[in-house]
Amino acid sequence: RTCIPIPLVMC
């Protein structure tokens, strides 16, 4: 899965 840096890091 990919980690997307938004307000919080979702992996």
Swiss-Prot record:
Is Transport a UniProt keyword of this protein?
Answer: no
Transmembrane regions listed in the UniProt entry: none
Keyword Secreted (UniProt)? yes
Task: Cite the record's tissue specificity text.
Answer: Expressed by the skin glands.
Q: What is its main location?
A: secreted
Compartments it resides in: Secreted
Q: Which cysteines are joined by disulfide bonds?
A: C3-C11
**GO CC annotations, alphabetized:** extracellular region
- Which keywords belong to this entry? Amphibian defense peptide, Disulfide bond, Secreted
Q: Name one GO biological process term.
A: defense response
Chain's role: Stimulates insulin release from beta cells at a concentration of 100 nM and release of glucagon-like peptide 1 (GLP-1) from enteroendocrine cells at a concentration of 100 nM in vitro. Reduces secretion of interferon gamma from peritoneal cells in a mouse model. Has no inhibitory activity against Gram-positive bacterium B.megaterium Bm11 or Gram-negative bacterium E.coli ATCC 25922 at concentrations of up to 100uM. Has no hemolytic activity against mouse erythrocytes.
The protein's name is: Tigerinin-2O
State the species of origin. Hoplobatrachus occipitalis (African groove-crowned bullfrog)
